[in-house]
């Protein structure tokens, strides 16, 4: 089997590192570096386990894209710290001690020569979805703690799997179409697309998506298993001769405007204009700029984490 392309959900991983690694871990100058250490250590573990020859850290260049807000104004509204005028991305509410650590992580990635991928006006989910969907050569492993990305699982044209970090990296679960179908009771032949439709119907308070009132995850899964797709569910709800319960029909038809708008909000983009920070996504076996990498590691107090990353890279074939 070919070595995989590993796509890391940057924000998901450094948020989890920030909250999962003690804040007592600091740089020599006293600045917290718990997220930096946790992120680099997690990346080393993923490289050791998955043995990729290509890797990209995917970024939110716009964590709350305007096209999604235009469709569902409540989308992530509760996480806005400071609205920005003139179409600029709103400022996200982020712990004060995390923001400077994100800059440190990106400095280290740049010095090491590890690719960072982003697309103006799009979230990291869209970057991950675009890169996974357009891959035609290597199997893809998406690493994230965001369940929304289960919609990208696929078997063709290349296997796309999601390493879900919901309970942490040590207890991560690998999902493909079969696992998504089994876990959520969805049609196996379109498990990824069906998961997006499940999320749309169920809603997601953490993203400000209301869902269809009175339709929870179990009901949504039952509807998808019975009818096959969201379009077919709505066709059945619109059919007076349907066997669908009257109360459920009423709920779905009352929410038809939301369902239509939310479809584009919930589904990740697969055509985002993604660019890389490096010429290719080839995973470097040694730091591109060893002097700068060493200087940053010393300044941030993460020499041991960089050593663990290098040890993981040393196990890969040249």
UniProtKB/Swiss-Prot annotation:
One GO MF term: 5'-flap endonuclease activity
Domain 5'-3' exonuclease: 194-278
Enzyme superclass (EC): hydrolase
Enzyme nomenclature, EC number: 3.1.11.-
Disulfide cysteine pairs (residue numbers): none
SMART domains on file: 53EXOc, HhH2
Record SUPFAM superfamilies: 5' to 3' exonuclease, C-terminal subdomain (SSF47807), PIN domain-like (SSF88723)
Keywords tagged on the record: DNA-binding, Exonuclease, Hydrolase, Nuclease
This protein's record includes keyword DNA-binding: yes
CDD domains listed in its UniProt record: H3TH_53EXO (cd09898), PIN_53EXO (cd09859)
Function comment: 5'-3' exonuclease acting preferentially on double-stranded DNA.
Protein name listed in UniProt: 5'-3' exonuclease
The species this protein was found in: Mycobacterium tuberculosis (strain CDC 1551 / Oshkosh)
């Amino acid at each position: 089997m070919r070595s995989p392309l590993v796509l890391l959900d940057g924000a998901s991983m450094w948020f989890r590192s920030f909250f999962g690694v003690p804040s007592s871990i600091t740089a020599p100058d006293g600045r917290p570096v718990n997220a930096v250490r946790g992120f680099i250590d997690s990346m080393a573990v993923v490289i050791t386990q998955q043995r990729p020859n290509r890797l990209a850290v995917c970024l939110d260049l716009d964590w709350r894209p305007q096209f999604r807000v235009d469709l569902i104004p409540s989308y992530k509204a509760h996480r806005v710290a400071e609205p920005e005028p003139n179409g600029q991305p709103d400022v996200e509410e982020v712990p004060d001690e995390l923001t400077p650590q994100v800059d440190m992580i990106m400095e280290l990635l740049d010095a090491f020569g590890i690719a960072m991928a982003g697309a103006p006006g799009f979230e990291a989910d869209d970057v991950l979805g675009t890169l996974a969907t357009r891959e035609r050569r290597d199997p893809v492993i998406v690493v994230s703690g965001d369940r929304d990305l289960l919609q990208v699982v696929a078997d063709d044209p290349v296997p796309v799997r999601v390493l879900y970090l919901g309970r942490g990296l040590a207890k991560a679960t690998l999902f493909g179409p079969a696992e998504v179908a089994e876990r959520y009771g969805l049609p196996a032949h379109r498990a990824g697309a069906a998961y997006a439709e499940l999320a749309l119907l169920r809603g997601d308070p953490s993203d400000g998506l209301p869902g269809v009132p009175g339709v929870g995850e179990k009901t949504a899964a039952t509807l998808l298993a019975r009818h096959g797709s969201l379009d077919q569910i709505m066709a059945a709800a619109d059919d007076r001769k349907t066997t669908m319960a009257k109360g459920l029909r009423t709920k779905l038809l009352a929410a038809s405007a939301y369902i239509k708008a939310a479809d584009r909000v919930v589904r990740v983009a697969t055509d985002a204009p993604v660019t890389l920070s490096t010429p290719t996504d080839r995973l470097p076996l040694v730091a591109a700029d060893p002097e700068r990498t060493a200087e940053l590691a010393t300044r941030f107090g993460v020499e041991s984490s960089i050593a663990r990353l290098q040890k993981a890279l040393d196990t890969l074939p040249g």
